[in-house]
Amino acid sequence: MSQENVERLQAVYSEWARGNFRPGGQLFAPDVAFEALTDGRAAIGRDAVEGYMREFLAQWTEFRIEAEDFVEVGETILVTERHHGTGKSSGVEAEMTVYSVWTFRDGVVVRVRWEIDRASPLEAAGLTE
């Protein structure tokens, strides 16, 4: 199942790299925990995740996420991401590397967490560098 989970995430990230953030919701469990990087708050449930993403994306004139690497350990997948965006109010272009940990259970995502530091997600996934 874990390789199938990686392939499903790769398809989602392929769309996210184009700035299309609609794909992905079908992967979430009804009570998914979505722990954002920007403000530390968590969105619980599909509707809350959708609302959070709408609010987040409204801050950008252009935003996309490219996946650079997928590391799987059981039902946990660590993704190295490259975020690109242009701020709506500032017009400033931003780019940064971010790490996400996707936890699957029975083929659906039950938790996603983002970090700036690679060590924390590696530890959460049971890996070391």
Question: What are the functions of these language-model segments?
Answer:
Residues 4-7, 14, 21-75:
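A solvent-exposed, acidic/Ser-Thr-rich amphipathic alpha-helical stretch
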Residues 82-105:
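Exposed beta-sheet edge and beta->alpha loop/turn motif
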Residues 89-92, 120-127:
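A short, polar/proline- and glycine-enriched secondary-structure boundary/capping micro-motif
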Residues 99-123:
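Short beta-strand edge/turn micro-motifs at domain boundaries
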